[in-house]
């Protein structure tokens, strides 16, 4: 698991240079769901996060903290797994096709 899609792309390149095949030898998952992830071969499995909602909640929290520094809150936002082809399936099924990965994005 990589903390960003960009790092995942770099990891895939590094694994390839060492002769490892993704997903046959090693699985890779990114985080961010950047547009480039859909154009890789295989498509990158990634976690999508609601950037707009995170920005809105951040502004709300900062505004409240300016008025009352003790007004703290933990905010949990939903995330979603976007299945690509960089994770080896343990159940024997084939990884999603480019079309099915695009439909789920």
PLM feature segments, named:
Residues 1-98:
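Flexible loop/turn connectors
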């Amino acid at each position: 698991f990589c903390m960003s899609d960009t790092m995942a792309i770099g990891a895939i390149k590094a694994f390839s240079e060492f002769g490892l095949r993704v997903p046959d030898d090693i699985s890779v998952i990114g985080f961010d769901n950047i547009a480039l992830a859909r154009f890789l071969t295989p498509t990158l499995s990634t976690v999508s996060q609601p950037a707009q909602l995170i920005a809105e909640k951040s502004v709300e929290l900062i505004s409240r903290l300016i008025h009352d520094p003790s007004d703290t809150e933990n905010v949990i936002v939903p995330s979603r797994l976007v299945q690509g082809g960089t994770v080896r399936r343990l159940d024997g099924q084939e990884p999603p096709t480019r079309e099915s990965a695009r439909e789920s994005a």
